[in-house]
Amino acid sequence: MRHGHGLRKLNRTSSHRLAMLKNMMNSLIEHEAIKTTVPKAKELRRVIEPMITLAKVDTVANRRLAFDRLRDRDSVTKLFNELGPRFAKRPGGYTRILKMGFRVGDNAPMAFVELVERAEEGAAEAKAAE
């Protein structure tokens, strides 16, 4: 039986998939909004939401767990100093996935992944990038 095994393989090896998700987590923490395909966005949501929940309680052990998963000191610092306190009263649902049409080259469905309570400077950056 195949119960409870609902992860997407995304046509990648396991090491490539893990590295890609780490990079996407770091980008989302740094920029607070990224553009990607819909399946990647849905997988990213599955891994970033527990990281933000972990950052709500700022302990050395939690920082070490976060660093083990992110491998970037700047991302861990921002996660615990800015994002954890920002989402302290929100019981989950930290990300929003907005569908935004199809990619020109291969017609892949694209999505905009952003943190729900974005900082104002992050919102201004995203509008400038569009």
Curated annotation (Swiss-Prot):
Gene3D superfamilies referenced in this protein's UniProt entry, alphabetically: Ribosomal protein L17
Any single Pfam family the record assigns to this protein: Ribosomal_L17
Source organism per UniProt: Delftia acidovorans (strain DSM 14801 / SPH-1)
Highest taxon, organism lineage: Bacteria
Example of a GO cellular component annotation carried by this entry: cytosolic large ribosomal subunit
Gene Ontology biological process: translation
Keywords of the record: Ribonucleoprotein, Ribosomal protein
Assembly notes: Part of the 50S ribosomal subunit. Contacts protein L32.
Signal sequence, start to end: none
Gene Ontology MF: a single term: structural constituent of ribosome
Name by which UniProt lists this protein: Large ribosomal subunit protein bL17
Family statement: Belongs to the bacterial ribosomal protein bL17 family.
